[in-house]
């Protein structure tokens, strides 16, 4: 498996990354004991060695895997990788190789005989006479999973505590989704479940050295937008500021993962998630340890790479994987020509949202280190200030908004996207920059159904005309932090009306919404529209409490010192 393909300027190790080493035959009994949150040394300089895991499906039974995915045996490429092998995958693959050329061989029957299917999450059994808030409260139990042990050869990773899945095809927990889900759990009074989800993420950090995209073997080679510090902040709002010190070891490991390799970079070089610019400042990008097709989207990726003639397929695969790590899979933000997926160059982009989240992580670490008894040798407040200065220098467009920066071509994007509001959400924007960004967003991205993701139509799901619950909340919360209450209310109420209209018609909440007046679910992407839906449920509850209707009673929020307050 190739791991060392890199763009010009990337500094790569010749060794296979530890999270992706193939360890055939190892079972989940070799996991760290569920429920144990190991106390890592403070200011751990390197990421801990990850726990051994079974190989991903594309490595465990490669020939069978490719036959199923290439043959489009299932409409959704993710479906097969979630199947449970009923015996040793190597034996299944050997039997496939011995039988597949025989006359009358039936691939579907072979799969059915050797795998157990994982059904989608069902949420349609809820009463049809419920109001929106009650419906969400009834949804939570249907979205809860408890998997502190999984069968051998499963692609699922065990977690010590119950957790909430998004719904539909998403039968596992997802990193950045979960923050917005946890907001709703707290509003619903499900504070124990919210705490358990936080502890699961701390466990993942302790076990694998980072929080993977989701709790599947095929997600271990990457992470997702780093919201762990926001989860800790949310829990501090429930329990008090001692929470910051409790999760300090995991916050430090999370930071070490995202910053790994930064100390050794020369100007103009990149390694993993970090890039050192010509002026010496360090900013981050999205990345994936592997440069092969994603198992859960194998055919999509191979077809995309086949369209590219001017660079290696491995480079395309890594950029597709990095795009998946971004959460925005996919969007014009990552496309060189702004339209075609084959021009994807995610690893060349320094995203404004990612760097805002890491600023919040640095501020949270500074706050945790200030707690009585904490011992920290790094000045995280200074690191946050350095990042803020780098963002202002490289990610601020003087036309009046924050944008992404291409570190290879040294060009700042002129595209206005919903990500421009992340610096407000993280509390790093100056008052002037916040005001100008709000004005630009109002003119460019405001739609009848809320905040548009971008103003570009590409057919990708993270572009016009779709609206996503997490981006609505980032916008509303960020704008309110800077006194832009009117625009925040407009965005929040418009999106809430869209959610309510679709709910009134179909009695469900969905993953994404079209923002025109017909109150439809969103389109585009590699799979059908999903309902459930974790982060929409959470954001809807937050908006209902901010902008209550006739049957909604808003409870006053408990105030906690936030890590960005010292930086304003």
From Swiss-Prot:
InterPro entries: 6-hairpin_glycosidase_sf, 6hp_glycosidase-like_sf, Glyco_hydro_37, Glyco_hydro_37_CS, Trehalase_periplasmic. Disulfide bonds: none annotated. One of its GO terms (molecular function) is alpha,alpha-trehalase activity. Keywords: Glycosidase, Hydrolase, Periplasm, Signal. The active site is at 329 (proton donor/acceptor), 511 (proton donor/acceptor). It catalyses: alpha,alpha-trehalose + H2O = alpha-D-glucose + beta-D-glucose. Substrate binds at residues 169, 176-177, 213, 222-224, 294-296, 327, 526. The keyword Transcription regulation does not apply. It comes from the Bacteria. It is found in: Periplasm. Residues 1-39 form the signal peptide. Belongs to the glycosyl hydrolase 37 family. Provides the cells with the ability to utilize trehalose at high osmolarity by splitting it into glucose molecules that can subsequently be taken up by the phosphotransferase-mediated uptake system. This is Periplasmic trehalase. It comes from Xanthomonas axonopodis pv. citri (strain 306). The gene is treA.
């Amino acid at each position: 498996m190739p791991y060392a393909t890199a763009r010009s300027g990337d500094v790569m190790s010749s060794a296979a990354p530890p999270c992706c080493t193939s360890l055939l035959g190892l079972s989940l009994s070799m996991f760290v004991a569920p429920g144990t949150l190991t106390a890592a040394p403070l200011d751990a300089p390197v990421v801990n060695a990850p726990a051994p895991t079974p190989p991903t499906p594309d490595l465990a039974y490669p020939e069978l895997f490719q036959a199923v995915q290439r043959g489009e045996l299932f409409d959704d490429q993710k479906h097969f990788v979630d199947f449970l092998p009923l015996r040793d995958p190597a034996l299944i693959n050997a039997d496939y190789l011995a039988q597949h050329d025989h006359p009358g061989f039936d691939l579907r029957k072979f799969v059915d005989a050797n795998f157990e299917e994982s059904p989608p999450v069902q949420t349609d059994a809820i009463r049809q006479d419920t109001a929106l808030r009650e419906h969400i409260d009834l949804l939570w139990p249907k979205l809860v999973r408890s998997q502190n042990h999984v069968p051998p050869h499963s692609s699922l990773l065990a977690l010590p505590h119950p957790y909430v899945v998004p719904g539909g095809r998403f039968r596992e927990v997802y990193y950045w989704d979960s923050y917005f889900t946890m907001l709703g759990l707290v509003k619903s009074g499900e504070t124990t479940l919210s705490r358990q989800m936080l502890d699961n993420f701390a466990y993942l950090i302790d076990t694998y050295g980072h929080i993977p995209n989701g709790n599947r073997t095929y997600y271990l080679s990457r992470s997702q937008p780093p919201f762990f510090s926001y989860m800790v902040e949310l829990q501090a709002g429930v329990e008090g500021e001692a929470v910051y010190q409790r999760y300090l070891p995991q916050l430090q490991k999370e930071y070490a993962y995202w910053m790994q390799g930064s100390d050794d970079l020369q100007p103009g070089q990149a390694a993993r998630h970090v890039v050192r610019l010509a002026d010496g400042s360090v900013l981050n990008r999205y990345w994936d340890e592997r440069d092969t097709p994603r198992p859960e989207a194998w055919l999509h990726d191979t077809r995309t790479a086949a369209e590219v003639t001017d660079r290696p397929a491995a480079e395309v695969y890594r950029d597709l994987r990095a795009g998946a790590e971004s959460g925005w899979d996919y969007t014009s933000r990552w496309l060189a020509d702004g339209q075609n997926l084959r021009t994807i160059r995610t690893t060349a982009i320094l995203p404004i949202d990612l760097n805002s989240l890491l600023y919040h992580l640095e501020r949270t670490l500074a706050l945790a280190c200030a707690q009585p008894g904490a011992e920290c040798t790094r000045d995280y407040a200074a690191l946050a200030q350095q990042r803020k200065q780098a963002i202002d220098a490289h990610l601020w467009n003087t036309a009046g908004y924050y944008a992404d920066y291409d570190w290879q071509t040294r060009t700042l994007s002129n595209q206005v996207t919903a990500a421009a509001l992340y610096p407000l959400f993280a509390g790093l924007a100056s008052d002037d920059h916040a005001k100008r960004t709000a004005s630009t967003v109002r003119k460019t991205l405001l739609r009848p159904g809320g905040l548009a993701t971008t103003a570009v139509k590409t057919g990708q799901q993270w572009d016009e005309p779709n609206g996503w619950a997490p981006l609505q909340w980032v916008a509303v919360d960020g704008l309110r932090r800077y006194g832009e209450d009117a625009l925040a209310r407009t965005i929040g109420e418009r999106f809430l009306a869209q959610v309510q209209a679709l709910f009134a018609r179909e009695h469900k909440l969905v993953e994404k919404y079209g923002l025109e007046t017909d109150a439809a679910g969103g389109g585009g992407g590699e799979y059908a529209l999903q309902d459930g839906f974790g982060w929409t449920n959470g954001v809807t509850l937050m908006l209902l409490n901010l902008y209550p209707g006739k049957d909604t009673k808003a409870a006053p929020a408990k105030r906690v010192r936030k890590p960005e307050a010292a930086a304003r």
